[in-house]
């Protein structure tokens, strides 16, 4: 009886191991981080899919897990990222770990605004912004607009350009120094009352 059980266990293990790998070709997948349909070509092995994933206007090379999380390198992959106080939907080119931007890359919003730099666990750490939506509370007033320039974890850092409108709807631009997310040092402020 014991020999039969061992033989049965060995055969079952052999069947399970050989059944864990299956070649897939052009199978559509629905990815969990957005409602995107993609084509995958590769081998399913123990819940992971190593190989290329092609979507509408984007591609990925690496590993796709059974939970539809990507780890590897992507180009224009739809995802979310935390950008200095707000979570944004967009596309990402660079390294992904478990479906999140991680390492050096470029995150682009639907508006065309972008952040190029370092990410960690889906959060932007430091780099350069181009027309990134930004809100500044300064001197009891709220200023909303876009920022172009260097960013660190606390916000704008160094020389940058911020333009938009204040709470009263008046247009302004600030081209100058920033430190810790606040205007600092020399710069030029233009608003519609001063022009």
Language-model features and meaning:
Residues 1-8:
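Bacterial N-terminal signal peptides that target proteins for export
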Residues 9-16:
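Bacterial N-terminal signal peptides
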Residues 20-195:
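Glycine/tyrosine- and acidic-biased, solvent-exposed loop/turn segments at the edges of beta-strands
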């Amino acid at each position: 009886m014991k020999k039969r059980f061992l033989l049965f266990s060995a055969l079952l293990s052999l069947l399970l191991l050989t059944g864990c790998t299956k070649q897939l070709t052009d199978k559509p997948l629905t990815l969990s981080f957005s409602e995107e349909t993609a084509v995958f070509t590769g081998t399913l092995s123990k819940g992971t899919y190593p190989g290329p994933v092609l979507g509408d206007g984007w591609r990925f090379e690496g590993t796709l897990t059974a939970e539809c999380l990507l780890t590897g390198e992507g180009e224009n992959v739809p995802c979310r990222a935390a950008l200095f106080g707000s979570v944004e939907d967009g596309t990402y080119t660079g390294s992904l770990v478990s479906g999140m931007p991680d390492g050096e890359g470029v995150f682009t919003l639907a508006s065309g605004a972008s952040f190029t730099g370092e990410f960690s666990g889906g959060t932007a750490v430091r780099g350069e912004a181009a027309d990134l939506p930004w809100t500044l509370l300064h001197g009891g007033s709220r200023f909303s607009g876009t920022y172009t320039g260097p960013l660190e974890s606390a916000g704008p850092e160094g020389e940058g350009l911020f333009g938009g409108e204040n709470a009263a709807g008046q247009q302004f631009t600030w081209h100058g120094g920033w430190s810790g997310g606040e205007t600092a040092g020399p710069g030029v402020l233009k608003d519609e009352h001063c022009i």
